[in-house]
Regions:
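Short, small/polar residue-rich loop motifs at catalytic or cofactor-binding pockets
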Residues: 73-74, 289, 442-443, 466, ...
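Thiol-/selenol-based redox modules, centered on thioredoxin-like
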Residues: 423-428, 558-613
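Structural microenvironment flanking redox-active thiols in thiol-disulfide oxidoreductases
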Residues: 482-546
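Short, acidic, Ser/Thr-enriched surface-loop or helix-capping motifs
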Residues: 81, 139, 451-452, 573-574
């Protein structure tokens, strides 16, 4: 059928404009949040100068933030902000499930696909809210990490990075592809956002852990084990990484990079990736040998835990990561709908932090006396003596910025949480499907046909009710059942208004025009008991006349045993028999979210004619 699987039009101007408008509105609210918090902070500090002075005298920390933690906090803070900005791409709202999430899951086991597709469907129910939520949550986490250098707020920022990172890793990266064939460090295994989560867990550690020499050793040991494991996986025979070509076809790595080079991106980058692909096809064994050896050496150095070994190896490892990032991962975000820079940048940050943790491990003797003698103050004690105005006055600018970042996260998450409570998809998804929606106002073409029960039905007999009209092939097993269910769901969504709306389908199959075929279709699709459902047929001459009046091309007769090839259409007719809306109806990928979105659009159109907003 011509319309089937043409899919979602991610560049649809209506959808793009709606997403941009949502981001602009929420962006203004985000700025207002920071402005109000800043104004409140300045005002209270002026009102309570003593509290502000006390804060100024106590700004020297008992224990300075170690360099390894600064690298993680600042580095991943910048990455989260950058990722949030990437999520603001106009095509991202409706394109992420179909062009990013589902393709990644396609090669994974069925249970992974079910988990990921469930998330994609839920995203698609409310794509504007989901797209905006992902922008502000990630920007908020990034600002939070950058602003909160120490204390409970800083540790909570680390936990937020862990939580959101795991959500993205599971549902957005399909568990980083660890269950899919072809798993390789070269293409980002075990998932970039899992590294974000690991970094967040390290940031969330209490300050007493900073002073432990074991922290650096455990971190470098973990990195070492991972790299050695990836080296073994890369060297494993039969996975296709050793030969540059096999039986005249590109090897595993060359095949991957060749595909990456075809994605939309700057010409110079595509040329570099193509050049590497050609080189790998000619020297695949040597390329894989270098990669395996480099991973093994780097892993062994990190496992040793010795800064003198890790330092020089880290420099070489960083060079390898940059080369991989450019020539194999394609910079991660320049091809297609990129959502992050991929794994090499966060990998270098984590490895650098691990090196700094063992190179500059603080000795217990160097701990300041104030830190040694300080009595920990618990949450109960803090709440007991808390004085809100003075607490605000004594707060630093970093704390205020952290509070603003938390507000930004809530700003993104709250609308999505509210939207998810609705079982009905946003009508914007229907508008993103290839097709058109035109507002019109002219007398609808007349028809006089027979319904599924053999009764005569004409457009005149339906006057006084809103008519939602479509054309269905009673033997179709692809689009038509989906459209029928959309009409059925629209009837359910109308509730008590359904009594004033007729759901009408006209037969679009020139070969099967008997009433018995219509009845069989109704039973199959659960429409037999729907009181306002009318499925109409007639003689071939009558049907051809109706098709012509509604400017619908005649269905294409295909070989016996196949479905009738046809387009998908829907019309909205008001109570006076005037055509008010024409829908180019394409069911796209046929997901539950798509169906619900079309049902919601039909429901809205009917309610507008009934006088409801």
């Amino acid at each position: 059928m011509p319309g089937m699987n043409s899919g979602i039009n991610v560049s649809n101007p209506i959808v793009v404009a709606a997403f941009k408008a949502a981001l602009v509105h929420q962006g203004l609210i985000a700025l207002l949040i920071f402005a109000l918090l800043g104004l409140a902070w300045v005002t209270v500090r002026i009102s309570f100068p003593a509290a502000a002075a006390t804060r100024a005298q106590a700004t020297a920390p008992a224990l300075a933030e170690p360099a390894w933690r600064q690298v993680l906090r600042i580095g991943f803070g910048v990455l989260w902000v950058f990722d949030g900005i990437l999520q603001a791409q106009p095509k991202m709202a409706v394109g992420l499930p179909s062009q990013v999430i589902e393709p990644i899951a396609a090669s994974s086991p069925r249970w992974v696909q079910q988990v990921v597709n469930w998330a994609g469907t839920n995203w698609s129910y409310h794509p504007m809210q989901a797209g905006a939520a992902s922008v502000w949550i990630q920007v908020g986490i990034g600002i939070w990490l950058l602003a909160a250098a120490r204390g409970p707020l800083s540790r909570l920022a680390g936990l937020a990075s862990v939580g959101w990172g795991l959500v993205v890793w599971v549902f957005g990266e399909s568990f980083g592809g660890i269950f899919a064939p072809g798993l390789t460090w070269l293409f980002g295994a075990p998932g970039a956002v899992l590294i974000y989560a690991v970094a967040g867990a390290l940031i969330a550690l209490p300050e007493r852990a900073w002073r432990s020499p074991w922290l650096g050793r455990l971190t470098t040991a973990g990195i070492g084990l991972f790299l050695v494991g990836m080296a073994v996986l890369q060297a494993w025979p039969g996975r296709g990484f050793w030969p540059g070509t096999a039986l005249g076809q590109p090897g595993t790595l060359a095949g991957m990079t060749g595909t990456m080079a075809q994605t939309p991106q700057p010409g110079f980058l595509s040329a570099w990736v193509n050049a590497f692909t050609t080189f790998d096809e000619a020297h695949g064994f040597a390329v894989n040998l270098v990669v395996v050896a480099a991973l093994a050496v780097a892993g062994a150095a990190f496992l040793s835990g010795r800064p003198r070994l890790i330092g020089p190896v880290l420099a070489g490892f960083a060079v390898l990561c940059v080369a991989d990032w450019v020539l194999i991962e394609d910079l991660g975000f320049l091809g297609g709908l990129g959502t992050d820079p991929n794994s090499m940048v966060p990998m270098v940050l984590l490895a650098t932090a691990g090196y700094l943790a063992v190179a500059r491990a603080p000795a217990a003797a160097a701990e300041p006396a104030a830190a040694q003698s300080a009595t920990p103050v618990g949450w109960r004690e803090r709440l007991r003596v808390a004085d809100a105005p003075r607490a605000v006055a004594s707060a630093g600018i970093r704390s205020v910025a952290s509070a603003g970042a938390i507000g930004v996260i809530i700003l993104g998450a709250a609308p999505m949480a509210v939207a998810q409570a609705s079982p009905v998809a946003d009508t914007i998804l229907a508008q993103s499907i290839n097709g058109s929606s035109n507002q019109v106002n002219f007398p609808a073409p007349a028809f006089s046909l027979t319904d599924q029960d053999g009764r005569a039905v004409s457009l005149v007999s339906l006057r006084g009710n809103v008519v939602l009209l479509t054309f269905l092939d009673d033997t179709c097993s692809v689009d038509c059942p989906l459209i029928a269910q959309e009409f059925r769901q629209a009837g359910q969504l109308l509730g008590t208004d359904a009594a004033r709306v007729d759901l009408v389908a006209i037969n679009y199959n020139p070969l099967d025009i008997q009433v018995s075929y219509l009845q069989a279709f109704d039973r199959q699709e659960g429409l037999a008991g729907v009181p306002n459902w009318l499925y109409l047929t007639g003689t071939l001459a009558q049907l051809e006349q109706v098709w012509s009046r509604y400017s619908i091309p005649p269905p294409e007769i295909v070989p016996a045993g196949s479905m009738i090839a046809h387009g998908d259409y829907a019309f909205v007719i008001d109570q006076a028999g005037h055509m008010r809306q024409e829908l180019g109806f394409d069911t796209g990928p046929g997901t539950q979210a798509t169906k619900s979105s079309f049902a919601a659009e039909l429901t809205d159109a009917a309610r507008q004619l009934l006088g409801h907003s």
